[in-house]
């Protein structure tokens, strides 16, 4: 019996033309941080890969990623922790290629962060249950890292804005840390005077500061906290999860002054020593951030540009190294090919009582 004739196929008909291959971005440049100095095309896309290391306090040169042993005071009044027992926020500024030779034009280009892939590094290191840990029982393995854990990261065109909230307003924080100034009992719930920018790595204790939800219009942040005495860390490992950084208008963080800011905290829990003392354990975080060029209305008048030459407006961040000999930028990729917004979300625009459009610098 002859095979059944396929529907729609005529004898002697010419074979169908195969579909054209799907168009994808063409890899133009690939390399280290020096690629960021290369001038790119109009439609180029840039990918930056970097990592942030934990700021746990570092008990000594052999225990990087661990805090000093945590002690507990008997009274609220005498609470005075040491700096090496306080996990702090990690942050860094990544310089991006300069896009505009002429800043007097009506429209300018800005880098816009579109997506980020991120992952905690070293998750499997916590499977080591034989290195001076307290035994579960006399003949057992060591007690694993467990307890309260906090995982957080942010990507933005400006430094992360923070709100101070304290567990005990009478706590005396050590030199080298930045805590809310002049705390009162209201600081334990909400004091709107406790505002700050995350402008220095390893200086802002996590227990004092949270991301400010009323601000950070030009930053996207994500975090989870799990509290408890015996809570195990739950972490995922994958290179397929992508976080979109666009808002409801389809606009991502705009990198002001060609600067990208990343921040992270990854506290996995408490490590219990054989003596019974405990230390915070932190891990590093990897980032892969995709950026595209966005045409925006020039928000900077000539008078502002001239004054900015004297009073540099760009926030200075003392972060982890992202350029130089010890740069933590792993890889930069630039794509060139297939592929009226206000350029400064911090500027206030309004119509005054005379019907005139006004712009106010905050």
Curated annotation (Swiss-Prot):
A GO cellular-component term linked to this record: host cell nucleus
Top-level taxon of origin: Viruses
Gene3D superfamilies with a match to the protein in the record: Capsid protein VP1,Polyomavirus (2.60.175.10)
Keywords from the UniProt entry: Capsid protein, Disulfide bond, Host nucleus, Host-virus interaction, Late protein, Phosphoprotein, T=7 icosahedral capsid protein, Viral attachment to host cell, Viral penetration into host cytoplasm, Virion, Virus endocytosis by host, Virus entry into host cell
GO biological process, one term: endocytosis involved in viral entry into host cell
Signal peptide: none
Residues bearing the modification Phosphothreonine: 338
Comment field on protein domains: A DNA-binding domain overlapping a bipartite nuclear localization signal is present in the N-terminal region of the protein and is required for efficient virus formation.
Role, per record: Forms an icosahedral capsid with a T=7 symmetry and a 40 nm diameter. The capsid is composed of 72 pentamers linked to each other by disulfide bonds and associated with VP2 or VP3 proteins. Interacts with sialic acids on the cell surface to provide virion attachment to target cell. Once attached, the virion is internalized by endocytosis and traffics to the endoplasmic reticulum. Inside the endoplasmic reticulum, the protein folding machinery isomerizes VP1 interpentamer disulfide bonds, thereby triggering initial uncoating.
Protein family (similarity comment): Belongs to the polyomaviruses coat protein VP1 family.
Protein name as it appears in the record: Major capsid protein VP1
Annotated source species: Simian virus 12 (strain wt100) (SV-12)
